[in-house]
Design a protein with these regions (language model features):
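ATP-binding N-terminal substructure of ATP-dependent carboxylate-amine bond-forming enzymes
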Residues: 1-126, 138-146, 396
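ATP-dependent carboxylate activation and anion-phosphoryl transfer catalytic cores
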Residues: 7-16, 20-24, 48, 71-73, ...
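Structural detector of well-ordered beta-strand residues that form the stable sheet scaffold
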Residues: 29, 79, 101-103, 131, ...
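A polyampholytic, Gly/Pro-enriched intrinsically disordered region
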Residues: 122-131, 153-154
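Alpha/beta catalytic cores of group-transfer enzymes, especially the acyltransferase/condensing modules
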Residues: 135
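Acidic/histidine-enriched active-site and ligand-binding environments that engage anionic O-linkages
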Residues: 147-156
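N-terminal nucleotide-binding beta1-loop-alpha1 segment
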Residues: 159
């Protein structure tokens, strides 16, 4: 087991990883920018190292400074959390060159899954169902029209190096295709420095289903069930559930088994999430995230297994602590992402939290690094906390969530809490009857 882990992140996930390390008896080092010197994870860590000014590129994305912090403190492993350098293959390779363990997959696997075209090819080879579309990058408009005609309209054009909805355009007819292609390539080039795009069939009313997987790097793989992340705004997840209200046990077992086998065959090590669009009983691969997800706590709630403990164990060479038959699903869990944003316009709302009170009681968990008097810096993601609620079934979970949201108090800034209080009273949400477009349509009604 590791002696000392450096946590290369900030906010709630840095505190989440720190807690896991302390439970395992591992010393902790956190790195931070000058804007985060009073953050909770900095206060609680055994050691902290300031690695630069507030801009991420000069601090949390500064590989040289993070490696230097490892060497200064004697850290033998790095946990990247999510975001920042968590899916940076170069970072993983540099750590390996310095004999420091990256708590995650190999640089090669990060590269494969980071290239959306190569990821789709790999998924197809591993037996994962994929969306009909081009085999690789689209070179010109003529090829785009040919592929679109073969798979049928509407189609969606996606950036090969993309994510978060950037470089993504829908064409409903051939007349739309030229503009959509040019716009997607332009956006992709500007956002990612790579204008390669590919085409897929556009699904009209899909759900977003993702499967949590783990590999030991030696040919074993397991799945921890699925999460439903269909409530989204501009391709950003807002509310997540486990398990999905749309799947039955047979579908869950089938897609989970496919994913676990794929991870084993790939020789993958650590945590990963295989994301799908789900429509009319069929799954279609979108991408694989080679890191811990923001929404991992809902999986922990229904399985009772600490996924960060599992990450650390696998990375240290201890292998998986569970077999597939050991993983049981109990009850239902929902996570709400509490952001420092206007609940209607979603504009950021940095500032000082004058009062912060979290809900409690059976089945309630709050992952947050903020506190009363904390000043939210304007430089980073607006997530200030996650409310995770577990119940014996979805009905109990929703009732408990309603109560927890009523108890949650954040004063001094605007947050998305009012949005969630509205959602828990909506009949569609109560029935689990929603798709990836539902939330944007709901919000548009109030504009």
């Amino acid at each position: 087991m590791f002696q000392k882990i450096l946590i290369a992140n900030r906010g709630e996930i840095a505190l989440r990883v720190l807690r896991a390390c302390k439970e395992l008896g591992i010393q902790t080092v956190v790195v931070h920018s000058t804007a985060d010197s009073d953050a909770m994870h900095v206060r609680l860590a055994d050691e902290s190292v300031c690695i630069g000014p507030p801009p991420s590129r000069e601090s949390y994305l500064n590989i040289h400074q993070i490696v230097a912090a490892c060497e200064i403190t004697g850290a033998d492993a790095v946990h990247p959390g999510y975001g920042f350098l968590s899916e940076n293959a170069k970072f993983a390779d540099i750590l390996a060159a310095h004999n420091i363990t990256f708590i995650g997959p190999s640089g090669d696997h990060i590269r494969i899954m980071g290239d959306k075209i190569e990821a789709k090819r790999t998924a197809k080879r591993l037996g994962i169902p994929v969306v009909p579309g081009s085999d690789g990058a689209i070179n010109d408009e003529k090829e785009a029209k040919r592929v679109a005609a073969e798979i049928g309209y509407p189609v969606i054009i996606k950036a090969s190096a993309g994510g978060g909805g950037r470089g993504m355009k829908v064409a409903h007819t051939e007349a739309d295709l030229e503009v959509a292609l040019q716009t997607a390539k332009s956006e992709a080039g500007a956002a990612f420095g790579d204008d390669a795009v590919y085409i897929e069939k556009y699904l009209e009313k899909p759900r977003h289903i993702e499967v949590q997987v783990f590999g030991d790097g030696a040919g074993r793989g397991v799945h921890f069930g699925e999460r439903d992340c269909s409530l989204q705004r501009r391709h950003q997840k807002v509310w997540e559930e486990a398990n999905s209200p749309a799947l039955n046990a047979e579908e869950r077992s089938r897609i989970g088994g496919i994913c676990a086998k794929a991870i084993a065959d790939l020789g993958y090590s650590g945590a990963g999430t295989i994301e799908f669009l789900y429509e009319n009983g069929e799954f279609y691969f979108i991408e694989m995230n080679t890191r811990l997800q923001v929404e991992h706590p809902v999986t922990e709630a229904i399985t009772g297994i600490d996924l960060v403990h599992e990450q650390i164990r696998v990375a240290s060479g201890g292998g998986l602590s569970v077999r597939q038959e050991d993983i049981k699903f109990n009850g239902h869990a929902i996570e709400c992402r509490i952001n420092a944003e206007d609940p209607r316009t979603f504009t950021p709302s940095p500032g000082t939290i004058t009062h912060f009170h979290t809900p409690g009681g059976l089945g309630i968990r709050v992952d947050s690094g903020v506190y009363s008097g904390y000043k939210i810096p304007p430089y980073y993601d607006s997530l200030i906390g996650k409310l995770i609620v577990h119940g014996r079934n979805r009905v109990e979970c929703m009732m408990r969530l309603r109560r927890a949201l009523d108890e949650f108090v954040v004063d001094g800034i605007k947050t998305t809490l009012p949005l969630f209080r509205d959602l828990v009273g909506n009949p569609d949400i109560a029935n689990g009857d929603y798709d990836i477009h539902w939330l944007e349509k709901y919000l548009a009604k109030d504009e």
